[in-house]
Amino acid sequence: MIINTIDKIYNPKNIEESIYNFWEKSNYFEPDIINNYKKNYCIMMPPPNITGGLHLGHAFQQTIMDILVRYQRMNGKNVLWASGLDHAGIATQILIEKNFYNKKNSIKDNHDPHSLIKEVWLWKEKSEKFINYQIKRLGHSVSWKNKHFTMDPEISLAVKEAFIQLYTNNLIYKGKQLVNWDSKLQTAISDLEVSHKQKSDFIWYIQYQLEYNTSHINNQKKNADYLTIATTRPETILGDVAIAVNPEDPRYSHLIGKYVFTPITNRRIPIISDKFVNINKGTGCVKITPAHDFNDYIIGKKYKLPMINIFSTYKTILTIPEISNNQGQPYIQSNDQYHIPKMFHNLDYKDARKKIIEECKRLKILEDIKTHQLTVPINNRTGTIIEPMLTDQWFIKTKFLAKQAINAVTNEKIKFIPKNYTNIYLQWMNEIQDWCISRQIWWGHRIPVWYDNNNTIYVGHCEKDIRIKNQLNKDIQLSQDNNVLDTWFSSSLWTFSSLGWPKNNTLLKMFHPTNIIISGFDIIFFWIARMIMMTMYLVKDQNNNAQIPFKKIYITGLMRDKFGQKMSKSKGNGIDPIDIIDGISKKKLLKKQLKENSQSKSISSIIKYINTQFPNGIKPYGADTLRLTLTALASSGQDIHWDMHKLESYHNFCNKLWNVSKFVITHTDNYHYDIDTKNKKIFSLSDRWITSKLHQTIQKFSQALNDYRFDHTVNILYEFIWHQFCDWYIEFTKPILYHSTNTLQLISTRYTLITSLESILRLSHPIIPFITEKIWQKIHSIVTTNNKHTIMLQSFPKYDSNYIDLESISDIEWIQNLIAEIRMIRTYTGISYKIPLDIGFYNTSNHIKECISENYHILTKILQLQTINFLEKNDISNNRYFKIPIKESELIIFIPNIFDKKTAIHKFNKEIKLINYKIHLLEQKMNNTNYSLNLQHSFKKSQEKLNHYNKTKNKLLNQYFIVKNL
C-alpha cells in the first residue's frame, strides 16, 4: 500500500535530480549485452561539439531521441542510445586561440601546437562535464557506458583504417584543386563553414584590347577595338586566362575564337563561348580567372585553360604566379607571359585592387564605376573573407561512393522523414563533387600519410607499420603529413566507429545498422550523406553486403526565436536549457550572455533583447515542462519558433497532472480492489466511458509516435488528460466518492481512477519522465504485480478494442451536451449555482430515460438540480422555461422566481452582438474570390464554422425573446 502522499505543490526541482540518479545508479539506461533475447533498437546521438554547452536546438533533438528510446524500451526492445562528443577541429582551435593567446597573431607562428593540444584536452574535460550535466538534467536516458569522443584511441583507429582502405582502393587522392581558403586560419574550410553576406561595393568596367581591329565586321561601330568587362574583383585581372561570351549573343558571336590582351600585363587570352554566360548581366562578357573563382574554375577545366594563382596563402600578390594546367599539374609552357608587374608584388589584395584601378585610369581603360550589391563569402567563425584558392589537398572520389548511397534511398532501405527531403538529398548526391578532407590546422586526426625525401607517399596506421610493410631501411627518413582530416571525416564514421569498428565486436553485430538518426536539415549533405556513403563502403554484413548506417532519417528544422531569428549565442537569443529548468534572474542572465559575447559588436542589441524578452528573468519550469514544450513544437521538418509563453501553458499541464494525481491517491489509497474487472456491468457509465476514451487515446498516441508526429502526441495527451480525464471524469466521480453508499460502485470507481491514472503515467512517460516516475512510485504497488521498480521498464499501454464501449461514448456525449446547455443558460441568465434548478424532458427515448435515471445522482450534484422529471405536454402551465432540443429528447429548463431579467437581457444582447461580429468577419473572408478559389479545404471549414455561428445565433435569439417576454 501507499505510505506517503505526494507533495502538496508540484516543484520539479525537488524531484528531478534524485530520480535521474536513481535511474543511472540502477543501470536502467544500459542495454543487455549478455542475455540478448529481445529485439534491439539503437540511436546514435549526433555528438555535440566540445566548443560549448548544449543549446535549445540540442535539447529539442535529444528530447525527440529520448522519447523514441523510452517508448521502444517500454515496448520490450533492448535499447542502446549511445552518446559522445565531437572534437570540432577548426571551431575548437579558434576557441583555444581566442581564450588563451594573442588574437592578432597566428597561433601556428608563435606557439608550439603540442602545448596547445594539452589546453584543448583540459577544455574538453570541462566541456564534457557540463554537457553531460545538461543531458542528465534534461532527463535523457543515454547509455553512459557507451559514450565516445571523436579523438578517442578507438575512434582514431577507425579513422585511420577508413583512410587506409579508401586510399588502397584508389578512392583517396592528393591533388591541386580550388577550395575555400581562410587566409587568417591558413586552412581550407568546408562549405558548411562559409556564410554569404550581402555587401554594398563597386563594380568596375574595364576595357580589354582586341588583338586586331574588328570594326568592319557586322557593322560594328568605328574604333570598337576592345571588349568591356564588368568586374567586382579587378585585382584578379592578373590571373585572367580567357573572356567568355554566350554563343547566342549577337553582339559578340563574331569574336568567338578571337583574342584580347589583358590590361596591364598584356597577355594574349582567347574569347570563348559558353551558355553559362548571362547575356543580360553586366556587359555580357565575363573574365575567366579559374584559380580564384569557383564558376570560372569549372569553365577552366571544361576548356582546358591554364590556371594562374596570383595570391599567397595570406592573400598577398605573389612575385611569381603559380601556373597549373586544368588537372592541377605544373604548367609546362614558358612562364614569361605570366609575369606579374613588380609594382604589385607582395601587396595585400585590397592594396592591389587600388593599384590596379589607378593603372587602369592611367591607361584610360577604366570605362565606368558603379555601386553594386554583391555577395561575399565569409568564414562564419572568424569573419574572414574566403578566397577561392588552388592548393594541394587530399580528396575523396565521391561519385563512386554516391551510387550506393543514392540506391539505398531510392530503394527505400533508408527513408527520410518527412519525405520531401528525399528529393533534396538525391539532387545533391547526383551533382556531388569530390570531397576535400584535409585541413591545415593542428587540432584533429593527423592524416595517416608519411613521405620520404623523394616525396613518395606511404599510408599506414603508424610509421612502424609502414617501415615493416614496405621493408624500409632505418636510413630512410619518413615525415608525417602535417595536415589533419576534416572533422566531418571522423563524424561520417560515427554510427559504426562508436560501436567498435573495425573490430567485429558484439555491439556492432547487435546494434548496426542503427534504427534512426535525428538531424537538422542544414547538415544533410555534410553529415547524413557522407555517413551513408562511408558506411556502405566500409561496413559489410555477414553476407558481405553493404550495411546502411540507419534505417530512417528524421529531419528537424532550425530553432528560432519568436521573431523568426535563428537562435545563436552571438545574437543573445540563444538559451541554455538549464536556465529554463532551474530558472535564472535577469541580472544573472544578462551577465552570462555578455560574458559569452564579450568580443561581440552587438552588446547593445543583446542587452536590449534580454531587457525586453526577459524583464523578470526566467522562472524555473523543470525538465518535463521544457520537454513537453519542445515536443509540442516538433512539427515535422518545420523550423521551431520558440516562445517562452508556451512554457507556461505546459507547466500548467504538468501542475494539472500533479494535482489530479493527488486527488486520485487521496481517494484510492489503502483500499482493496477485489472485483471482477471483466464484468462491465459493475462499472458505471462514466467508468466505461473513460476506459473507452483511454484506449482510443492509446491508439491515437501510438500511431502518432509511430508516424513521428511528436507534436500530435502532445495534443492527444493534453486533450485526454486535461479535458476528458480531469474536466469530465473526475467531476463524474466526485458525487460517487463523496456521497455514494453503494460499496461496489465505490470500489469500481476507485479502481477505474487508479488504473486510468497509472495508464496515463505510462502513456506520458516518454515525454515527461520525471513527474510520471515520481507519481508512479506512489501508486505502482496497487496496480502492478511485477518486480520492476521503475516506470521506464513497465510495458507501454496497449490498445485493446475490447475496452471500446461505443454506447457509453455516445451516452456521455449526450450528458456532456446536456451539461453544456444548462451551464450556458446559467451563464447567459446570471442564475447563480446557489439556486437549484428544476429541469424536465419531453419526447424522450427509453434509452435516454435509462441513461438519465442511471446517472440521476451525478447529474443533480454536478448541475445543482432540484428535480429531474419526464414531462407530458400538459405538465407545464406557464411560459417561464427554456425549451432546448437535444438528441432523442427536448430539454425543459424552468426559470426560477429569483431571476434578474435586466441582467439576463444585457448578457444576451452582448452575446448576440459578439456572434454577429464573428459572422460578419467570416462572411467577409469567405466572400473574397481568391480565398474561395485557392483554399477549398479552408473554405469548407469556414462554411462549417459559419453554420455553427448561425445556429448559435438562432438559439440565443430564441432564448432572448423568452426572457424578454417574461
Swiss-Prot record:
A motif ('KMSKS' region) lies at residues 566-570. ATP binds at residue 569. Residues 348-368, 939-960 form a coiled coil. It catalyses: tRNA(Val) + L-valine + ATP = L-valyl-tRNA(Val) + AMP + diphosphate. It is an enzyme of class 6 (ligase). It comes from the Bacteria. GO terms for biological process: valyl-tRNA aminoacylation. One of its GO terms (cellular component) is cytosol. Keywords: Aminoacyl-tRNA synthetase, ATP-binding, Coiled coil, Cytoplasm, Ligase, Nucleotide-binding, Protein biosynthesis. GO terms for molecular function: aminoacyl-tRNA deacylase activity; ATP binding; valine-tRNA ligase activity. InterPro entries: aa-tRNA-synth_I_CS, aa-tRNA-synth_Ia, Anticodon_Ia_Val, M/V/L/I-tRNA-synth_anticd-bd, Rossmann-like_a/b/a_fold, tRNAsynth_Ia_anticodon-bd, Val/Leu/Ile-tRNA-synth_edit, Valyl-tRNA_ligase. It is found in: Cytoplasm. CDD domains: Anticodon_Ia_Val. Belongs to the class-I aminoacyl-tRNA synthetase family. ValS type 1 subfamily. PANTHER family: VALINE--TRNA LIGASE, CHLOROPLASTIC_MITOCHONDRIAL 2, VALYL-TRNA SYNTHETASES. ValRS has two distinct active sites: one for aminoacylation and one for editing. The misactivated threonine is translocated from the active site to the editing site. Catalyzes the attachment of valine to tRNA(Val). As ValRS can inadvertently accommodate and process structurally similar amino acids such as threonine, to avoid such errors, it has a 'posttransfer' editing activity that hydrolyzes mischarged Thr-tRNA(Val) in a tRNA-dependent manner. Monomer. This is Valine--tRNA ligase. It comes from Blochmanniella floridana. The gene is valS.
